[in-house]
């Protein structure tokens, strides 16, 4: 089987990671003790992608939990599925990273990283044929961002030919823990551009807006935001966990989704949007799902796809429905909105259907878009970064851990380059002979 090793780092990474395991364990019929109580062979057919089978027929997540302080991991251990995880796979320090990227990447995190790599090695060795790694983390803090990106580069060194996927939570002033989030996020993106194959950008701004506007929650909690994240992660990984033809492993997903190696930041979406506890009471139709799925309000990244163009798209429909209708609706969307899909990648929308719907829904749709509009998210962080960096505000916390200002400047320009690359391909047409001479024409 093609196995995936899952790593969760930092407070946010551990919280969304724990939710992810709750949701997929439920979908595969695995209870908190690791015992299977399912009702369909489909649940077990590809169970080995995420679970090891232990003695006594128990299923154990192939998950590694990392943090620089014990708090969050204690709550995961005490949570509903806390006993499911392998006890040796909890690796934590005591000092904390204090929301400081440099502590996670260069000092505190660097001391713990070898312990983590030992467990990564052990998990990888027990795999039959490892396809790659997935990391859940946030970019705004210290551990998930700093140590998370350190882990990525170390794993990359040791497993250069395996796929590296991240679910990265991007900070937003609307749901902010710390004033230095733009620094931490920019330093992280600088790493992700170079060292990951696929990054799902989960944007706290978008999650907050969905909870507030669509779900009418006046004061969304992290629990509400994480409910959306776990639904999205479950949808995105459906093709990896259940039998099917399309995007059935991380590499095939990357091949379909990433036309240029640096442009691998995806905008996820989900339909129908439901709040925790109140699953939708009316069944949706395929046209409604399709329409909702492409709607800007359903995107988990606060970017408007109408401000850019799609390079590639993958859609995953779940539930019992007519394949013919799904294909018709997807073609319909593309024909009606063909201006929003680059014309120099024909057939750039791929669709998969899985029979097993998520709990509480008859059918759902998950959207993965590689849109040039994601540049809006990087621009937002870049502006916040520049505002502080030009005054050198808070820099002493980073230089005190041995960082150089130069590294900040490099990270800033790498992210700005990324924005211009997205812009360049947004404006490119089939006729353009050479992409190099951009800048001659402004956007209409």
Swiss-Prot record:
InterPro entries noted in UniProt: Beta-tubulin_BS, Beta_tubulin, Tub_FtsZ_C, Tubulin, Tubulin/FtsZ-like_C, Tubulin/FtsZ_2-layer-sand-dom, Tubulin/FtsZ_GTPase_sf, Tubulin_C
Residue numbers binding Mg(2+): 69
Entry annotated with the keyword Magnesium: yes
Main location: cytoplasm
Signal peptide: none
One Gene Ontology cellular component annotation held by this UniProt entry: microtubule
One Gene Ontology biological process: microtubule-based process
GO molecular function: GTP binding; GTPase activity; metal ion binding; structural constituent of cytoskeleton
Binding site residues for GTP: 11, 69, 138, 142-144, 204, 226
Keywords, sorted A to Z: Cytoplasm, Cytoskeleton, GTP-binding, Magnesium, Metal-binding, Microtubule, Nucleotide-binding
Cross-referenced SMART domains: Tubulin (SM00864), Tubulin_C (SM00865)
Intracellular or extracellular location(s): Cytoplasm, Cytoskeleton
Cofactor(s) the protein requires to work: Mg(2+)
Entry function: Tubulin is the major constituent of microtubules, a cylinder consisting of laterally associated linear protofilaments composed of alpha- and beta-tubulin heterodimers. Microtubules grow by the addition of GTP-tubulin dimers to the microtubule end, where a stabilizing cap forms. Below the cap, tubulin dimers are in GDP-bound state, owing to GTPase activity of alpha-tubulin.
Recorded family membership: Belongs to the tubulin family.
Self-association and partners: Dimer of alpha and beta chains. A typical microtubule is a hollow water-filled tube with an outer diameter of 25 nm and an inner diameter of 15 nM. Alpha-beta heterodimers associate head-to-tail to form protofilaments running lengthwise along the microtubule wall with the beta-tubulin subunit facing the microtubule plus end conferring a structural polarity. Microtubules usually have 13 protofilaments but different protofilament numbers can be found in some organisms and specialized cells.
Official protein name in the record: Tubulin beta chain
Provenance organism: Trichuris trichiura
């Amino acid at each position: 089987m093609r196995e995936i090793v899952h790593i969760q780092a930092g407070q946010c990474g551990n919280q969304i990671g724990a939710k992810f395991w709750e949701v997929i364990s439920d979908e595969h019929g695995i209870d908190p003790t690791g015992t299977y109580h399912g009702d369909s062979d489909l649940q077990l057919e590809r169970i080995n992608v995420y679970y090891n089978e232990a003695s006594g027929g128990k299923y154990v997540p192939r998950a590694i939990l990392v943090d620089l302080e014990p708090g969050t991991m204690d709550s995961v251990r005490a949570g509903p599925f806390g006993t499911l995880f392998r006890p040796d796979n909890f690796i934590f320090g005591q000092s904390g990273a204090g929301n400081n990227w440099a502590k996670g990447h260069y000092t505190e995190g660097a001391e713990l990283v070898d312990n983590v790599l030992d467990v990564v090695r052990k998990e990888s060795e027990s795999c039959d044929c490892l396809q790659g790694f997935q990391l859940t983390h946030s970019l705004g803090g210290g551990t998930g961002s700093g140590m998370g990106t350190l882990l990525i580069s170390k794993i990359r060194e040791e497993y250069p030919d395996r796929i590296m996927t991240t679910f990265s939570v991007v900070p937003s002033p609307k749901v902010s823990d710390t004033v230095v989030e733009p620094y931490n996020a920019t330093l992280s993106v600088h790493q992700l551009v170079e060292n990951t194959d696929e990054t799902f950008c989960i944007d706290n701004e978008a999650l907050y807006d969905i909870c507030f506007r669509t779900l009418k929650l006046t004061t969304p909690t992290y629990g509400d935001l994480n409910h959306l994240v776990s639904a999205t992660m479950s949808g995105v990984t459906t093709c990896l966990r259940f039998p099917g033809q399309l995007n059935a492993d991380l590499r095939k997903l990357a091949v379909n989704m990433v036309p240029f190696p640096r442009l691998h930041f995806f905008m996820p979406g989900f339909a129908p949007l439901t709040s925790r506890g109140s699953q939708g009471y009316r069944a949706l139709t395929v046209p409604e799902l399709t329409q909702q799925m492409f709607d800007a309000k359903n995107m988990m990244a606060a970017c408007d796809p109408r401000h850019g163009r799609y390079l590639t798209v993958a859609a995953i429909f779940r539930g019992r429905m007519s394949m013919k209708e799904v294909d018709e609706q997807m073609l319909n969307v593309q024909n009606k909105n063909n201006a929003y899909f680059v014309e120099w990648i024909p057939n750039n929308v791929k669709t998969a259907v899985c029979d097993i719907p998520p709990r509480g829904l008859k059918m759902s749709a998950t959207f993965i878009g590689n849109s040039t509009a994601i540049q809006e998210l990087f621009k937002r962080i870049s502006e916040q970064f520049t505002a502080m960096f030009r005054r050198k505000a808070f820099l002493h916390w980073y230089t005190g851990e041995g960082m150089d200002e130069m590294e900040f400047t490099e990270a800033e320009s790498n992210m700005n380059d990324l924005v211009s690359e997205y812009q360049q391909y947004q404006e490119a047409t089939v006729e353009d002979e050479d992409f190099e001479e951009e800048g001659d024409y402004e956007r209409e």
